A protein has these predicted regions:
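Extramembrane terminal tails and long inter-domain/linker segments of multi-pass membrane proteins
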Residues: 1-16, 56-59, 128-132, 169-190
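Cytoplasmic juxtamembrane interface segments
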Residues: 2-15, 77-101
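Hydrophobic cores of alpha-helical transmembrane segments in multi-pass integral membrane proteins
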Residues: 23-45, 65-88, 103-121, 147-163
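Perimembrane loop-to-helix junctions flanking transmembrane segments
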Residues: 49-65
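Short, membrane-exposed interhelical loops at transmembrane-helix boundaries
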Residues: 127-143
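C-terminal or internal capping secondary-structure element at the end of a domain, subdomain, or sheet
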Residues: 140-184, 190
């Protein structure tokens, strides 16, 4: 199918590139969840079984609950990034705003992935920069806490802005953002 608009702007190509990058980052976040599953396995087993009944023993730091979070949490963040990438194209988001929102969502996803892994190595689970009733702080606490808090606040604004574009923007674009979108150019998708 050819694009009926021969003067397509570079903005569509830029947003297509952003979407592909976001999907790639989301996939890598999901990959970290799978790696977290190996950490969970080795923590529970106290090592790795190389053949039936033969275990190479070693200590994997963290807690079982922490490794469960490492195995499950990044999946939600990966899906957040991928769904945002796929959904943003259906909203009348200007190119500059789309880039800013997209990268804030990606960085929030990665900061949360870091929170799960670094928090598992922290005495206070990465919930504070100092000593609290949960435990003492260390360098892992800082690495878990700071990026998650910074990007956690930024992503709230990013999703509020996306909500605005979806619900209240008066300049709703009647045209699809990409030729493969549902109903693009009056035809079914490929």
């Amino acid at each position: 199918m050819t694009n009926p608009n021969p003067n397509a702007t570079d903005g569509l190509m830029a947003q297509d590139s952003l979407r592909r990058r976001m999907i790639g980052h989301g996939a890598l976040m999901i990959l970290t969840a799978l790696l977290g599953g190996f950490g969970l396995y080795m923590h529970i087993m106290g090592g790795i079984e190389i053949s039936p009944g033969h275990l190479i023993t070693f200590n994997v730091p963290g807690t079982e609950a922490g490794w469960v979070r490492c195995h499950t949490g990044p999946v939600a963040n990966g899906f957040m990034v991928i769904v945002t990438a796929l959904g943003m194209v259906h909203l009348p988001v200007p190119e500059k705003a789309a880039k800013r929102i997209g990268w804030v969502v990606v960085m929030d996803g990665w900061s949360n992935v870091g929170f799960y892994f670094f928090g598992n190595l922290s005495p206070n689970r990465g919930l504070a920069l100092g000593k609290t009733h949960v435990g003492d702080a260390n360098v892992w606490s800082v690495l878990a806490f700071v990026p998650a808090v910074v990007f956690g606040f930024l992503v709230v604004g990013a999703f509020a802005e996306l909500g605005y574009y979806g619900l209240f923007d008066k300049n709703k674009s009647p045209r699809p953002r990409h030729e493969f979108d549902i109903g693009a150019y009056g035809q079914k998708t490929k």
